[in-house]
Amino acid sequence: MFFPIRALLAGRVQPLSRGEGSAIAKQPLSGAVQIGLFGIIGDEQADQVHHGGRDKALHHYPFDHYARWQEGAPDTALLSAAGAFGENVSTTGLDEDTVCIGDRFRLGSALVEVSQARQPCWKQGDRLAWADLPKLMVQEGRSGWYYRVIEPGQAQAGDELVLKDRPFPDWTARRVFDLLVGGKHKEDRAALAFLSDMDVLFEGWRMRARQFLDG
């Protein structure tokens, strides 16, 4: 299973409408891109509590979703090319229903592993001047996901993202997102128990599963 890389992207911290800084405005990179343990070399994160770090080194958002958001966006200018959602990796043909937690991919020469789905936040709505967008992303499960970098390397647009290992084929990013973010945590306690001990899942989400079990 392989997917052509449409774009690799990085950004610098800039102020949003509320004055808070964010590097959500990613720009496509040309040529070979260096990927380290903390993501693309030169990419920035303003909020390093909720973004970045080893477990959120790279954000992948499917370009397939752009057509859906063009339907309701007040201004579609930013939706004509990848980068509107702060993603570092853009592809087509792979989404939250077909990627699984723990999947390992070759991204160029780097090896990356899916660590969690992304939790939408107000900054995506702010960037597109669409306050309801984060809520819609949760409702529809169009969240994107994060990778941790297992082996640093380099990649460029036009390379392939190649699936190398899938240890948890039943645990799609969408299924885990719906349980831990989308409000379905009361429907399957056995699933929560499994997620609470799933070592490849981001520790913060394992803790969330435990909290739901204890609640």
Question: Can you name each region flagged by the protein language model?
Answer:
Residues 31, 143-145, 157-159:
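A short pocket-lining beta-strand/turn micro-motif at the edge of beta-sheets
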Residues 102, 152, 157-158:
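Loop/turn positions that initiate beta-strands
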Residues 1-126, 132, 168-215:
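Electropositive, beta-rich accessory/interaction domains or terminal extensions
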Residues 131-151:
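A mid-sequence, solvent-exposed acidic-amphipathic segment
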Residues 161-164:
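Short hydrophobic beta/alpha edge segments that flank linear recognition/processing sites
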